[in-house]
């Protein structure tokens, strides 16, 4: 396509798992689409994985914008929002949406003493 339309910007829109995409719990997708699928694009806007991240293919950013808010216990409360792209410069900015008032809180409690001594820890902020 670039050969026929060299002045155009090529944007990949993809909803699915890409190899090496990570989830909030640290799982790394090994069986997703290979990044070579995006050969020839200027940047990629990806969805499906709720963790905001950028995966590069030959220097080309393939960006999961993440989810607007926390969706389940496996996700952190923070780090959610949206991404705004500048198509001409092919750069993007990340914007967080603050939503710590509502969500799933996961606590680490090692013993009953942790509760009695107010030492329980929230582990998904």
Regions found by a protein language model. Name each.
Residues 1-125:
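Extended recognition/assembly regions associated with phosphoester-bond processing machinery
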């Amino acid at each position: 396509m670039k050969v026929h339309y060299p002045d155009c910007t090529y944007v990949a829109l993809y909803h699915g798992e890409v190899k090496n995409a990570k989830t909030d719990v640290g799982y790394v997708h090994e069986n997703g689409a290979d990044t070579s699928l995006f050969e020839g694009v200027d940047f990629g806007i990806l969805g499906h994985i709720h963790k905001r991240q950028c995966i590069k293919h030959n220097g080309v950013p393939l960006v999961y914008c993440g989810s607007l808010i926390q969706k389940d216990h496996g996700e952190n409360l923070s780090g959610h929002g949206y991404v705004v792209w500048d198509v001409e410069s092919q750069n993007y900015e990340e914007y967080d949406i603050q939503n710590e008032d509502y969500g799933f809180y996961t606590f680490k409690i090692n013993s009953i003493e942790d509760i009695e001594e107010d030492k329980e820890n929230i582990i998904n902020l």
